Amino acid sequence: MEIQAQDFGIEIEMTGITRSRAAEVIAEYFGTSKEYEGGYYDAYYACDSQRRKWKVMSDGSIDCQKRDGRRKISADRNYSVELVSPICQYRDIETVQELIRKLREAGAFVNPSCGIHIHINAAPFNAPKLRNLVNIMAAKEDMIYRALQVESRREQRYCRKIDTSFLERLNREKPTTREHLKNIWYNGDDGSYQHYHDSRYHCLNLHSVFQKGTIEFRAFNSGDTGSKGSIHAGKIKAYIQFCML
């Protein structure tokens, strides 16, 4: 499939501003209004010209901070900000970049707890293609983690490498159907109905395939997690393109 023909979604974690303020920034960019959705994730959203919702949600994994002069200090959970895009097309990458620039100007920054998750439409991937993707990732994972400088905390908990027992069984049984592959992924149980099934916390997340129809890549840091904590719009474009290849 041509890279420009693929749908994607992106989730970008950050702090430094509140969810309410982040939603205002997004609404200002689109020329629409901020809306409060509430719920478990205390979410806000703003619609674009196509009436697609760009959500701002709370995420429990984010260490919340705000600026106090030149210092960064602890902040309450209002500063837990995860930007969740609607289903996007290749042309929307520029929109994602502009939103990140606007949020950064408004005070958003990142720290080592913040990551980026990118979803690619799984519809074109049958079981053999998914197996091939798993093997490619397994062969390149160490290099990818080094290149992306994946934080050790995220690697150990939220962005684990491919499980060796899963990989061995996958290549031994060589599934030809999604159902067979699902059985291997969940080791005989069907966890696809659980949103927070533990198997989702891998760099290459196939739980997302069975739960929502997307392949999720979770290896990316939100930006420069050093003292500046900058969010890089250019890197985000490169990450999206990497997942589409």
What does each model-found stretch correspond to?
Residues 1-109, 123-245:
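C-terminal accessory/tail domains of diverse enzymes
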Residues 112-116, 120:
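Short, conserved phosphate-binding/catalytic loop or strand-edge motifs used
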